[in-house]
């Protein structure tokens, strides 16, 4: 094995409660009595659906379309283009998991470490800068114009980096996007199971945090 590809959010960087807090702020601004958790659950489903459509849209564009649709469904009056900024701002200043910097440093001495994330580029780079993280190769869905689990996402990265599927390990916390989809392409996978659920999706390895990769990979 020559390289390790990392998902970011939920894997290297915590999303915390930023998204649900943003929803609460949006609904409070509208003086709405809609249950924030239910509203957010619908938002996530719309977001995922748009990520899977044929026409590529950036996450920023998807967030706007999502909120416009939700405002229409719930009869909420207001400027969704203005209100969505609350959600977009929640994407910044997210915090790295504590074990990550040292683990990445150890892994990078033996393997090429590559970022492969379902996100727009600018917020991701801001989060890396905020946490003092530096990576040589960073791939985003915006740059690739494809979202996981589209095979194009993984295959373009492999092609540009000059690796075969057998030469890399993909590490992430999503069963479909980080385990099932890359596994179908012949890529080894590591599930980051921070909640220690013990779920099996056909992953090569299961870890509870990134530091556990080091002994597995001989670092």
Give residue spans per PLM region.
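Asp-based, Mg2+/Mn2+-dependent phosphohydrolase catalytic module
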Residues: 1-4, 32, 78, 101, ...
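N-terminal helical cap/lid subdomain that shapes the substrate entry/recognition surface
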Residues: 1-98
């Amino acid at each position: 094995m020559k390289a390790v590809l990392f998902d970011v959010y939920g894997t290297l960087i915590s999303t915390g409660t930023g998204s649900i807090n943003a929803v609460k702020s949006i609904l409070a601004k509208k003086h709405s009595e809609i249950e924030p958790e239910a509203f957010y659950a619908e938002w996530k489903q719309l977001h995922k659906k748009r990520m899977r459509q044929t026409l590529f849209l950036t996450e920023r564009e998807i967030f706007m379309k999502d909120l416009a649709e939700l405002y229409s469904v719930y009869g909420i009056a207001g400027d969704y283009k203005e209100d969505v900024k609350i959600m977009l701002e929640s994407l910044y200043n997210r915090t790295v998991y504590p074990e990550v910097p040292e683990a990445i440093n150890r892994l990078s001495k033996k393997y090429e470490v590559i970022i492969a994330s379902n996100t727009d580029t600018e917020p991701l780079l801001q989060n890396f800068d905020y946490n003092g993280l530096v990576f040589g190769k960073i791939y985003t869905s915006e740059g690739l114009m494809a979202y996981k689990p589209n095979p194009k996402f993984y295959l373009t990265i492999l092609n540009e980096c000059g690796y075969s599927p057998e030469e890399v390990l993909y590490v992430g916390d999503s069963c479909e996007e980080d385990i099932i989809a890359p596994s179908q392409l012949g890529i080894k996978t590591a599930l980051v199971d921070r909640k220690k659920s013990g779920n099996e999706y056909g992953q090569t390895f299961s870890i509870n945090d990134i530091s556990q990769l080091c002994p597995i990979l001989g670092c």
